From Swiss-Prot:
<comment type="pathway">
    <text>Sulfur metabolism; glutathione biosynthesis; glutathione from L-cysteine and L-glutamate: step 1/2.</text>
</comment>
<dbReference type="InterPro" id="IPR007370">
    <property type="entry name" value="Glu_cys_ligase"/>
</dbReference>
<keyword id="KW-0547">Nucleotide-binding</keyword>
<dbReference type="GO" id="GO:0046872">
    <property type="term" value="F:metal ion binding"/>
</dbReference>
<keyword id="KW-0317">Glutathione biosynthesis</keyword>
<dbReference type="Pfam" id="PF04262">
    <property type="entry name" value="Glu_cys_ligase"/>
</dbReference>
<keyword id="KW-0067">ATP-binding</keyword>
<dbReference type="GO" id="GO:0004357">
    <property type="term" value="F:glutamate-cysteine ligase activity"/>
</dbReference>
<comment type="similarity">
    <text>Belongs to the glutamate--cysteine ligase type 1 family. Type 1 subfamily.</text>
</comment>
<dbReference type="GO" id="GO:0006750">
    <property type="term" value="P:glutathione biosynthetic process"/>
</dbReference>
<protein>
    <recommendedName>
        <fullName>Glutamate--cysteine ligase</fullName>
        <ecNumber>6.3.2.2</ecNumber>
    </recommendedName>
</protein>
<dbReference type="GO" id="GO:0005829">
    <property type="term" value="C:cytosol"/>
</dbReference>
<dbReference type="GO" id="GO:0005524">
    <property type="term" value="F:ATP binding"/>
</dbReference>
<keyword id="KW-0436">Ligase</keyword>
<dbReference type="InterPro" id="IPR014746">
    <property type="entry name" value="Gln_synth/guanido_kin_cat_dom"/>
</dbReference>
<dbReference type="InterPro" id="IPR006334">
    <property type="entry name" value="Glut_cys_ligase"/>
</dbReference>
Length: 525
């Protein structure tokens, strides 16, 4: 335990009410499927509103890939309640369709038959669609159908000046806050393998997902591929394999180096993309021919974030106003849970992220960067292997020993959160994770394989059974009339807003894309 962490724990202990002001938000992606478990080919239901302008129900890559977004709230229980209500509303509009329960996709149609999300005729709507066409061109449509949970978290704004004073730091509050979030991200890189062990839930997938590509997976049955000790094949290197992004590892030494590396990637041509061009047969196929079309194309396990103004790019927001929160992007959907995540997981994530924020976080050199990546990939592919060793400070250490050590340190943050909020919910959440470390059969990834074995099911059969169970849960609990009407109003207003944007649109789309592209080059640190 570092002296720095001890000092910061004492500071928090003297300011416990502040810990009630952390903010949390969840984004859950899930595929719409037919009642037989095939990808829905229907358009995004109009009764859910506009995917462009509805702030709570939208689409991700595909017209069939829904995304539910909660507001940012101080209590994770409220966040999960909001997410659950959104599921209940959506099920009131889905007819016979289902929401697919796990992260790895259902039976997919031919690559060209996976529908790309549509956002209407406004320039911003077209830009979102062309960006997704570019993703299809660069990475294939199949990979874009993987779903996940994103967990957004911020520390209280009032805490940063106290920490800065305690550290004797002379930066501005804004710069100190940004540096502290980047330090959190460095520690997240060091320790996120633990989340993969505890919450990874994708040890198997449908054989058709790989489209005949070479792989190192084993056959579980005629339709299912898996690895016996895998925790999260979703986060393994069978997912995104991008030669263009291979050399792009944004430096997490400070905010400026991070935004600078992304800005360069958005402005640097990549020869294979240049060869294709932005148009084929007069149609847009990608926004530009650079390493990244836009910043969000960079695939990472965690992102520093700042809420953007209308028309503002993420890098512009970060550069001008600093980091506001982090977005954790490596969490699998738990197929046993109706909304894919529960309060126990959320409470542990809060303690884990607080630990990452407050523990000493030295800069990562190239050697440690590689070690972090290796540990992460080892755990997603074989995290439950008995006696598995990772590397800490260049030396081997058994996963179980390191995990128990980390949980002991994170436990001090859980204790503080419980003191601030009353009760012992965070301590219980921590104990549930220690139980998984002691007994790997309790992990979600082990449970998935165990259930498939018990029922003699393929991945698709298991997933469809879970999806139907959750559908029944939601359909049997319609929303109270008042809440249902609030969602209906949100949907109607979003459709009206999209219509207004389209009617008021001025200017040519090509010029709009040019201006959008130029905006990134005008930013200076």
């Amino acid at each position: 335990m570092s002296d720095l962490l001890n000092r910061r724990l004492s500071l928090l202990g003297a300011n416990l009410p502040l810990l009630k002001q952390c903010l949390h938000g969840i984004e859950r992606e899930c595929l719409r499927v037919t009642d037989e478990g095939r990808l829905a080919q229907t358009p995004h239901p109009e009764s859910l509103g506009s995917a462009l302008t509805n702030e709570q129900i939208t689409t991700d890559y595909s017209e069939s890939l829904l995304e539910f977004i909660t507001p940012a709230l101080p209590d994770p229980a409220q966040v999960l309640e909001s997410l659950e209500q959104t599921h209940r509303f959506v099920y009131s509009k889905l007819g016979d369709e289902l929401l697919w329960s796990p992260s790895m996709p259902c039976t997919l149609p031919a690559e060209e038959d996976i529908p790309i999300a549509e956002y209407g005729a406004s320039n911003i709507g077209k830009l979102k669609h062309v960006y997704r066409k570019g993703l299809a061109l660069r990475y294939g449509r199949t990979m874009q159908c993987i779903a996940g949970i994103h967990y957004n978290f911020s520390l209280p704004e009032a805490l940063w000046p106290l920490l800065r004073a305690s550290d004797g730091n002379e930066q501005s509050d804004r710069d100190y806050q940004s540096a502290a979030y980047i330090a959190l991200i460095r520690n997240f890189r060091r320790y996120s393998w633990l989340l993969m062990y505890l919450f990874g839930a994708s040890p198997a997938l449908d054989k058709g997902f790989l489209r005949g590509r070479p792989h190192q997976l084993e056959e579980l049955d005629a339709e299912t591929l898996y690895l016996p000790y895998a925790t999260s094949l979703r986060m393994s290197d069978l997912g995104y394999q991008s030669n263009a992004q291979a050399g792009l590892t944004p430096c997490y030494n400070n905010l400026a180096s991070y935004t600078d590396s992304l800005r360069k990637a958005v402005g640097t041509p990549y020869p294979p993309y240049v060869e294709i061009g932005t148009h084929v047969d007069g149609e847009w196929v990608q926004l530009n021919t650079n390493i990244l079309q836009i910043e969000n194309e960079y695939y990472s396990n965690i992102r520093p974030k700042r809420v953007t103004y209308t028309g503002e790019r993420p890098i512009q927001a970060l550069t001008s106003r600093g980091v506001q929160y982090v977005e954790v992007r490596c969490l699998d959907i738990n197929p046993f849970l109706p909304v894919g995540i529960d309060l126990t997981e959320a409470r542990f994530l809060d303690a884990f992220l607080l630990f990452c924020a407050l523990e000493d976080s030295p800069l990562l050199d190239n050697g440690e960067c590689g070690q972090c990546t290796d540990n992460f990939l080892t755990v997603v592919k074989e995290g439950r292997r008995p006696g598995l060793e990772l590397r800490r400070d260049g030396h081997p250490i058994e996963l179980k020993a390191w995990a128990s050590d980390l949980l002991g340190r994170i436990g001090q943050l859980a204790e503080l959160l419980d003191r601030a909020q009353g009760g012992d919910e965070h301590a219980k959440a921590l104990a549930a994770q220690q139980a998984k470390v002691d007994d790997a059969s309790l992990t979600p990834s082990a449970q998935v394989l165990a259930r498939m074995g018990e029922h003699e099911e393929s991945f698709i059969q298991f997933s469809l059974r879970q999806s139907r169970l959750h559908a029944e849960t939601f359909r049997e609990q319609p929303l109270p009339t008042e809440r249902q009407q609030a969602y209906e109003t949100l949907a109607r207003n979003s459709l009206a807003e999209q219509s207004r944007l389209e009617q008021e649109e001025v200017g040519d789309f090509d010029l709009f894309v040019g201006a959008y592209q130029a905006s990134i080059l005008a930013i200076s640190n």
